[in-house]
Amino acid sequence: MAIEGVLNEGFVTTTADKLINWTRTGSLWPMTFGLACCAVEMMHAGAARYDMDRFGVIFRPSPRQSDVMIVAGTLCNKMAPALRKVYDQMAEPRWVISMGSCANGGGYYHYSYSVVRGCDRIVPVDIYVPGCPPTAEALIYGVIQLQNKIKRTNTIARKG
């Protein structure tokens, strides 16, 4: 069988997909977008007790250096354009984790006139972490779920 036959079956690209996705799962760099009390739990998850560095998660201060955004807390209408702007500054591929009831759907302030009822109305969300506020363990579980999602994606476009 010639190399053309191997390429047509997708063997080379699927192997490259697995390799690329494996390296991405071990080097997630989230950009912290802490808006309320959930940000304290996010900081707790990055501290010494839970140490998210062991999963390859290193918090970055700049959106240009990160590929994951963790939206933690209540998103107000005035902050929504800033959230979108920061999301647009992130390099592809990028993922979003919505952390807490307020970021997921408005939470306690759902019926307030100034609160966005879920950050998924502003940016596409990949993983939802429930809780008010969610524990550090829940955030770590969400990161592990994001790693599993990344492993299942196709990164190299194939011609149909």
From Swiss-Prot:
Q: Does the keyword Nuclease apply?
A: no
Supply the InterPro entries for this chain. Answer: NADH_UbQ_OxRdtase-like_20kDa (IPR006137), NADH_UQ_OxRdtase_20Kd_su (IPR006138)
Q: What is this protein called?
A: NADH-quinone oxidoreductase subunit B
Can you quote the record's cofactor note? Binds 1 [4Fe-4S] cluster.
**Oligomeric and partner information:** NDH-1 is composed of 14 different subunits. Subunits NuoB, C, D, E, F, and G constitute the peripheral sector of the complex.
Query: Localized where?
Result: Cell inner membrane
User: What membrane topology does the annotation report for this chain?
Assistant: Peripheral membrane protein
**Species:** Cupriavidus necator (strain ATCC 17699 / DSM 428 / KCTC 22496 / NCIMB 10442 / H16 / Stanier 337)
Question: What protein family is recorded?
Answer: Belongs to the complex I 20 kDa subunit family.
Which Gene3D superfamilies did the record assign?
Answer: 3.40.50.12280
The cross-references to PANTHER family, in alphabetical order and at most eight, read:
NADH DEHYDROGENASE, NADH DEHYDROGENASE [UBIQUINONE] IRON-SULFUR PROTEIN 7, MITOCHONDRIAL
Q: Which domain of life is it from?
A: Bacteria
What's the stated role of this polypeptide? NDH-1 shuttles electrons from NADH, via FMN and iron-sulfur (Fe-S) centers, to quinones in the respiratory chain. Couples the redox reaction to proton translocation (for every two electrons transferred, four hydrogen ions are translocated across the cytoplasmic membrane), and thus conserves the redox energy in a proton gradient.
Q: Mind telling me which Pfam families this protein's record contains? A: Oxidored_q6
- Identify the keywords attached in UniProt to this record, alphabetized: 4Fe-4S, Cell inner membrane, Cell membrane, Iron, Iron-sulfur, Membrane, Metal-binding, NAD, Quinone, Translocase, Transport, Ubiquinone
Enzyme Commission designation: 7.1.1.-
Named cofactor requirement(s): [4Fe-4S] cluster
Q: Which GO terms describe its molecular function?
A: 4 iron, 4 sulfur cluster binding; iron ion binding; NADH dehydrogenase (ubiquinone) activity; NADH:ubiquinone reductase (non-electrogenic) activity; quinone binding
